[in-house]
Amino acid sequence: MNIWLNMLITTGLGAIIGGYTNHLAIKMLFRPHRPIYIGKFQVPFTPGLIPKRRDELAVQLGKMVVDHLLTPEGIGKKLTNKEFQTSLIRWTQVEVDKVITNEQSLRDMLEKWNLEHVEEEAIGKIEHVITEKIHAFLAEYYTYTWEQALPHSVHEKVENAIPNVASFILKRGISFLESEEGKERLSKMIDDFFASRGTLLNLVGMFLGNVSLVDRVQPEVIKFLGQDGTERLLTDVLQKEWEKLKGRDVKELETFVEKEMIVNSILSAVKVEETVSRFLNQSVQQVCEPVRETIVGKVVPSAVEKGLKWGTENVGSILGNLQLAEIVQQEVSTFSTERLEDLVLSITKNELKMITYLGALLGGTIGFIQGLLLLFLK
């Protein structure tokens, strides 16, 4: 009976010692969190292994992540994976479609993103571009004559229109002279003419008798304007003036109209501020609807594919610039010892328990063997 009791005691003590030893060893990985001193003497094994080597652990974790986990090769394979690309394209299409079908106005979107100043900047930049283009256009065309500046088609249209213009002027002149207003104007012109000549009017009056001078002159003027020769004469005059104009410099226009007046007139006609305001008052959906299918169906897949291709080609430099090892090191260094302990235990809790149980099993086995040895030695 004593023999079996001795074996039970040695086995139990061995199991307790083995299990507790392993449990203590595991605890000493993390505890104590800080060094313990007796006077000036630091107690051995304080602090625990992980608190003591936390900085080195942070460095090694950073290297492990960069060298073995987030490697350029691994990320490159992921980026070139067809399933991943298809999934990313579909996700991007859904998200982009949500944005371009938004019922909010562009102005509301800009306010939401704190970009209210964009409207003012857009107006300023558009007006600046238009102004620069006008100045460049005028600077170039001011070096030309009208013949060089105007397109050949304009020359043809003007020259073909001259006879019609001459005919139009004469017809309008005849129509005006036949009216009462025209007759009154002609009469006044005749009176003014003879008033400056004194006795000449009396001499003409003797020849005409009681007939009004305007009644004699009006039909003759109308007859003159209606003759073919008059039309040819006016056509020739207009043609000569047109030829003179073609030889003159466009720059002469500046003496009549200043550049700034031209610029302001064009800007006023374009109404940049009103146009931009009207554009921003539209909803995102209204603006994007005409190109929605193109954006979602073509632009997004193409952009994602090109982006992934660029990312694959530059993944090494991207990871280098991100300095992942340093990021991991800094993050781990900021962990408190308690948090680091909880993190490790949450991952290895079951395994560490098994190590404790294994220590108890080995200790119990050794105690049992010791009991057998004592039995045989007796």
From Swiss-Prot:
Predominant subcellular localization, coarse grouping: membrane
The lineage, from the top, is: Bacteria, Bacillati, Bacillota, Bacilli, Bacillales
Q: What is this protein called?
A: UPF0754 membrane protein BcerKBAB4_0766
Question: Could you tell me the membrane topology recorded for this protein?
Answer: Multi-pass membrane protein
Q: Which family does it belong to?
A: Belongs to the UPF0754 family.
Q: Which cysteines are joined by disulfide bonds?
A: none
Task: Say if the entry is tagged with keyword Ribosomal protein.
Answer: no
Highest taxon above the source species: Bacteria
**Classification via InterPro entries:** DUF445 (IPR007383), UCP032178 (IPR016991)
The residues that cross the membrane are 1-21, 357-377
Keyword terms of this UniProt record: Cell membrane, Membrane, Transmembrane, Transmembrane helix
Q: Quote any Pfam family the record assigns.
A: DUF445
What is the species of this protein? Bacillus mycoides (strain KBAB4) (Bacillus weihenstephanensis)
Cellular component per GO, a single term: plasma membrane
What are the subcellular locations of this protein? Answer: Cell membrane
